[in-house]
Swiss-Prot record:
It is an enzyme of class 6 (ligase). Belongs to the GatC family. This is Aspartyl/glutamyl-tRNA(Asn/Gln) amidotransferase subunit C. Allows the formation of correctly charged Asn-tRNA(Asn) or Gln-tRNA(Gln) through the transamidation of misacylated Asp-tRNA(Asn) or Glu-tRNA(Gln) in organisms which lack either or both of asparaginyl-tRNA or glutaminyl-tRNA synthetases. The reaction takes place in the presence of glutamine and ATP through an activated phospho-Asp-tRNA(Asn) or phospho-Glu-tRNA(Gln). The gene is gatC. Pfam families: GatC. Heterotrimer of A, B and C subunits. The keyword Nucleotide-binding applies. Gene3D superfamilies: Glu-tRNAGln amidotransferase C subunit, N-terminal domain (1.10.20.60). The keyword Hydrolase does not apply. One of its GO terms (biological process) is glutaminyl-tRNAGln biosynthesis via transamidation. It comes from Prochlorococcus marinus (strain MIT 9211). The lineage of its organism: Bacteria, Bacillati, Cyanobacteriota, Cyanophyceae, Synechococcales.
């Protein structure tokens, strides 16, 4: 495995647009080297008989079909608004021209 240098960490930080404090560069260098060591260990694991997957556990869709229901609460909801104009909610302006 290639040795990670402080310059490597600075370059990665620049590419990631991170502003790393200079006094922590050595700490991050050591941590990044350990992480890459773990990745190297994972590369040695035999995965020949393991099927490719995108998740560690099986995921099923638990959503239900939408049910359209007629309701009479439109006016009640509009009346709850602190500020309205006719059938519309009035909200503070957030964009300028």
């Amino acid at each position: 495995m290639t040795k990670i240098t402080s310059d490597d960490v600075r370059k990665v930080a620049t590419l990631a647009r991170l502003n790393l404090p200079e006094d922590l560069i050595d700490t991050y260098t050591s941590q990044l080297e350990k992480i890459l060591g773990y990745v190297a260990q994972l590369e040695e694991v035999d995965t020949e008989d393991i099927p490719p997957t995108s998740r560690a556990v099986e995921v099923t869709n638990v959503l239900r079909e939408d049910i359209i229901q007629e309701t009479d609460i439109r006016e009640d909801l509009i009346n709850l608004a602190p500020n309205r104009e006719g059938d519309f909610f009035r909200v503070p302006k957030i964009l300028s021209e």
